[in-house]
Amino acid sequence: PTWLMITEARSKEVEYLKEGMTTGVHCITTLHTDDVRKIPIRIVGMMGNNVDKKQETDELYMVLDLGIHLTIKEDSDGFIHREIDQICYYDKDLVTSENICHMIVDKGQLFEENVPDKLRERVQEAIHSDDIFSCKELKEKISNN
């Protein structure tokens, strides 16, 4: 398959998710956490006690791409809105073995300078443009939060 979609990762199914990612399958799921930096730890925690937590965490930083955290806000009319609160790019420095979480959006604020070159290049190739923030309306909305 090209994509593996799990509506909500709650327990052992995260092992199938990670297995898919390590074979090059794109994966998407939802899970409960209050910060994108906790996503790898949360996934490892759902794998159970019979895993090497450090090794699993290290591998997740190599296969995860983006983490996105949404917040729920209610407007003055009582309507519920979900807004992007955080976006990060997971990375592994193969020289130092450091796990890196590049915070691209934090508290709704965009930090363009935190977009690593390899992510920037992937997005540029996908959208056929050098300006990865070419959606001016989205950029303005994120900057105004």
Task: Set out the residue ranges of the language-model regions.
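Conserved P-loop NTPase nucleotide-binding/switch module
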Residues: 1-63
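H-loop (His-switch) and adjacent beta-strand-loop-beta switch element
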Residues: 70-72
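Short proline/glycine-enriched turn/loop segments at secondary-structure junctions
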Residues: 56-57, 74-76
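Residue-level detector of flexible, active-site-proximal loop/helix-junction positions
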Residues: 34, 74, 91
